[in-house]
């Protein structure tokens, strides 16, 4: 029997409490504490002390379950898995089996990250667009409970002959027969393409320069920087022979990018790499997508024991934080939960906490293996073989603000490293401990590991609201005050750390309300306030006000301790120069990020955050993925 503490309801704000009631609690549950206790009992594997500890972690907001776990039990067919990664194999059986699998997954509440491995149109194939149109339509065909419709993303290699058509599927205008407005899209980008972009962006400016000792010295330094990079190897010896005099002709050769039919291996067309890259950047600016998956970076990080089995990563998932091997026999499974960094100081050295969280997700995974229908045999095979889980985080920006640390400062970088190094080291120990107690995953035989992967940082915007209105994932707050509409009414939400500061600084209630009104009028920004110091204004910068390179470098630093990926979104002003946007994207690849999620803009942000409308009765109003919440 779990001992429930109703006083922990005070940890919710009004919006978080209402969101939990509207979207996750069962009709016969009168308190959020009952919901947490139910989840703890379901996934404790009959270990009552574990159930009590899991309840305590959730009710104290240390641990956030993913959405399918949080809503578990509301429907008979639901399974506690957030997202699935099927691979669309280029055979008749592969096409049929994947369609059946995806339909089943949509009905049980899973988001889809589809790897597209089929050929361009020929005498036997209609190409990718007609197939993807069926998936686009099915997004609206399956309603998952009361809160959302199905949601899919498709990933295509950047060398596929239909890549340009694929990039146009979500853009405004054009033939409606080639539009996929319900289907998110992502692009697999290899190092070979990014090296071309890096070379061209580094050396192209010299083409227009007059030869002189200064420019030739700068040119040689630029070439040396490229040659010395870890991305360049034996195949790039030609860089040593690049000449200033013949640079234009040499760069024309570099700029050639072959589009290759994956079925025949034949080059179907050659286009300019720079034009394709610019199309990707502009499409992201216009639509927020495609997501970018640097597939070679992901595969380099794949554990050697899985490489030895001939496995490889072919795509990411709906929210770009999961990178696991897939093929015609494996549909990767996302089994997620998040640690609330707002409480990092309380649980960071609690060894039992890490063991319990990993055990909890292992139990969730086993429940899926035991209860999944036969249609999901590929997903069950993947889950059983690698037992991958994704322990993530939320509340990073909130934690920094609680310490009055500016997210762009050196202390923030040091805290970032400390947090994720601490989590990783504890989980490595737990992986071996559970491997000894419960046995190695089949993929991991000989390593002592229970899990092939243990960490992935999901976007978890909804979870952050429920978990005490903390900041989502590792993203900054988008505004310090915003209004959110739900089916139960409107809520004005305040940054809790700023609220505490203003209550201390401005005792008069009416004066304080005038300050909040002023913040609201400035799109949630505090940069205009005379009542705050320069340092305090830095601490409470909103996402649009933060240098995106700082966010990329923070993500790159923590990636060293994350064995999967992160849902890393970037914000740019609508009038931002494309050269700056290119620079940030290039830096993300150079510094080892595996994926980029959404491209945000102020136009979207103003609507999305200062007046954030999410009427949960209408799935069309939910722009962000909720499957990986956790």
Swiss-Prot record:
<keyword id="KW-1015">Disulfide bond</keyword>
<protein>
    <recommendedName>
        <fullName>Ribonucleoside-diphosphate reductase large subunit</fullName>
        <ecNumber>1.17.4.1</ecNumber>
    </recommendedName>
</protein>
<keyword id="KW-0560">Oxidoreductase</keyword>
<feature type="active site" description="Proton acceptor">
    <location>
        <position position="317"/>
    </location>
</feature>
<feature type="site" description="Allosteric effector binding">
    <location>
        <position position="119"/>
    </location>
</feature>
<dbReference type="InterPro" id="IPR000788">
    <property type="entry name" value="RNR_lg_C"/>
</dbReference>
<dbReference type="InterPro" id="IPR013509">
    <property type="entry name" value="RNR_lsu_N"/>
</dbReference>
<dbReference type="GO" id="GO:0004748">
    <property type="term" value="F:ribonucleoside-diphosphate reductase activity, thioredoxin disulfide as acceptor"/>
</dbReference>
<feature type="site" description="Allosteric effector binding">
    <location>
        <position position="90"/>
    </location>
</feature>
<feature type="site" description="Important for hydrogen atom transfer">
    <location>
        <position position="83"/>
    </location>
</feature>
<feature type="site" description="Important for electron transfer">
    <location>
        <position position="597"/>
    </location>
</feature>
<dbReference type="InterPro" id="IPR039718">
    <property type="entry name" value="Rrm1"/>
</dbReference>
<feature type="site" description="Interacts with thioredoxin/glutaredoxin">
    <location>
        <position position="625"/>
    </location>
</feature>
<dbReference type="Pfam" id="PF02867">
    <property type="entry name" value="Ribonuc_red_lgC"/>
</dbReference>
<feature type="active site" description="Proton acceptor">
    <location>
        <position position="321"/>
    </location>
</feature>
<dbReference type="GO" id="GO:0005524">
    <property type="term" value="F:ATP binding"/>
</dbReference>
<dbReference type="InterPro" id="IPR008926">
    <property type="entry name" value="RNR_R1-su_N"/>
</dbReference>
<dbReference type="Pfam" id="PF00317">
    <property type="entry name" value="Ribonuc_red_lgN"/>
</dbReference>
<feature type="active site" description="Cysteine radical intermediate">
    <location>
        <position position="319"/>
    </location>
</feature>
<feature type="site" description="Important for electron transfer">
    <location>
        <position position="598"/>
    </location>
</feature>
<feature type="disulfide bond" description="Redox-active">
    <location>
        <begin position="83"/>
        <end position="334"/>
    </location>
</feature>
<comment type="subunit">
    <text>Heterotetramer composed of a homodimer of the large subunit (R1) and a homodimer of the small subunit (R2). Larger multisubunit protein complex are also active, composed of (R1)n(R2)n.</text>
</comment>
<feature type="binding site">
    <location>
        <begin position="317"/>
        <end position="321"/>
    </location>
    <ligand>
        <name>substrate</name>
    </ligand>
</feature>
<feature type="binding site">
    <location>
        <begin position="459"/>
        <end position="463"/>
    </location>
    <ligand>
        <name>substrate</name>
    </ligand>
</feature>
<feature type="site" description="Important for hydrogen atom transfer">
    <location>
        <position position="334"/>
    </location>
</feature>
<comment type="similarity">
    <text>Belongs to the ribonucleoside diphosphate reductase large chain family.</text>
</comment>
<dbReference type="GO" id="GO:0009263">
    <property type="term" value="P:deoxyribonucleotide biosynthetic process"/>
</dbReference>
<feature type="binding site">
    <location>
        <position position="111"/>
    </location>
    <ligand>
        <name>substrate</name>
    </ligand>
</feature>
<feature type="binding site">
    <location>
        <begin position="82"/>
        <end position="83"/>
    </location>
    <ligand>
        <name>substrate</name>
    </ligand>
</feature>
<feature type="site" description="Interacts with thioredoxin/glutaredoxin">
    <location>
        <position position="628"/>
    </location>
</feature>
<keyword id="KW-0215">Deoxyribonucleotide synthesis</keyword>
<comment type="function">
    <text>Ribonucleoside-diphosphate reductase holoenzyme provides the precursors necessary for viral DNA synthesis. Allows virus growth in non-dividing cells. Catalyzes the biosynthesis of deoxyribonucleotides from the corresponding ribonucleotides.</text>
</comment>
<feature type="binding site">
    <location>
        <position position="67"/>
    </location>
    <ligand>
        <name>substrate</name>
    </ligand>
</feature>
């Amino acid at each position: 029997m779990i001992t429930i503490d109703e006083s922990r309801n005070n940890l919710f704000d009004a919006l978080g409490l209402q969101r939990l009631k509207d979207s996750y609690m069962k009709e016969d549950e009168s308190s959020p504490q009952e919901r947490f206790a139910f989840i703890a009992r379901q996934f404790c594997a009959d270990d009552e002390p574990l159930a009590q500890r899991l309840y305590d972690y959730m009710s104290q907001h240390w641990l956030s379950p993913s959405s399918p776990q949080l809503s578990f039990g509301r429907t008979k067919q639901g399974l506690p898995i957030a997202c699935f990664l099927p691979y669309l194999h280029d055979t008749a059986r592969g096409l049929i089996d994947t369609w059946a699998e995806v339909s089943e997954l949509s009905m049980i509440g899973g988001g889809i990250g589809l790897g597209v491995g089929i050929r361009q149109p020929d005498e036997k194939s209609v190409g990718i667009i007609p197939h993807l149109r069926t998936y686009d339509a099915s997004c609206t065909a399956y309603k998952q409970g009361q809160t959302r419709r199905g949601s899919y993303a498709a990933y295509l290699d950047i060398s596929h002959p239909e890549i340009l058509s694929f990039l146009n599927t979500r853009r405004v205008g054009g033939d409606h027969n080639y539009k996929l407005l319900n289907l998110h899209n992502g692009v697999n980008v290899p190092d070979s393409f990014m090296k071309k972009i890096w070379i061209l962006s580094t050396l192209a400016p010299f083409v227009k320069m007059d030869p002189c000792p200064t420019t030739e010295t700068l040119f040689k330094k630029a070439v040396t920087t490229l040659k010395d990079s870890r991305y360049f190897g034996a195949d790039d010896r030609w860089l040593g022979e690049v000449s200033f005099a013949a640079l234009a002709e040499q760069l024309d050769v570099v700029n050639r990018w072959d589009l290759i039919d994956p079925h025949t291996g034949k080059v179907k067309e050659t286009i300019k790499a720079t034009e394709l890259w610019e199309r990707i950047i502009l499409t992201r600016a216009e639509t927020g997508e495609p997501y970018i998956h640097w597939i070679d970076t992901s595969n380099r990080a794949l554990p050697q024991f899985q490489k030895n089995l001939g496995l490889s990563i072919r795509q990411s998932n709906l929210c770009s934080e999961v990178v696991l091997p897939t093929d015609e026999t494996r549909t990767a499974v996302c089994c997620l939960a998040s640690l609330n960094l707002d409480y990092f100081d309380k649980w960071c050295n609690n060894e039992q906490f890490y063991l319990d969280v990993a055990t909890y997700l292992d139990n969730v995974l086993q429940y899926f293996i035991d209860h999944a229908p036969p249609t999901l045999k590929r997903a069950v095979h993947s889950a059983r073989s690698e037992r991958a889980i994704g322990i993530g985080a939320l509340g990073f920006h909130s934690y920094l603000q609680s310490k009055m640390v500016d997210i762009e400062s050196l202390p923030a970088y040091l805290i970032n490293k400390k947090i994720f190094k601490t989590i990783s080291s504890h989980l490595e120990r737990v992986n071996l401990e559970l491997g000894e107690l419960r046995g190695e995953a089949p993929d991991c035989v000989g390593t002592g590991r229970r899990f092939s992967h243990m960490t992935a940082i999901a976007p978890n915007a909804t979870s952050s609201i429920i978990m005490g209105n903390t900041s989502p994932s590792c993203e900054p707050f988008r505004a310090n005050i915003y209004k959110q509409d739900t089916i139960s009414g409107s809520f004005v939400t305040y940054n809790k750390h700023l609220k505490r500061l203003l209550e201390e600084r401005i005792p008069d209630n009416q004066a304080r309300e005038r300050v909040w009104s002023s913040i609201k009028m400035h799109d949630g920004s505090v940069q205009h306030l005379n009542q705050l110091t320069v340092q305090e204004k830095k601490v409470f910068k909103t996402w649009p006000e933060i240098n995106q390179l700082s966010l990329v470098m923070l993500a790159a630093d923590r990636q060293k301790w994350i064995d999967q990926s992160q849902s890393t979104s970037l914000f740019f002003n609508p009038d931002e120069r494309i050269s700056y946007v290119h620079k940030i994207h290039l830096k993300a690849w150079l510094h080892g990020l595996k994926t980029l999620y959404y491209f945000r803009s102020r136009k979207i942000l103003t609507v999305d955050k200062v007046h954030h409308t999410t009427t949960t009765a209408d799935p069309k109003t939910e722009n962000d993925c909720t499957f990986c919440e956790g």
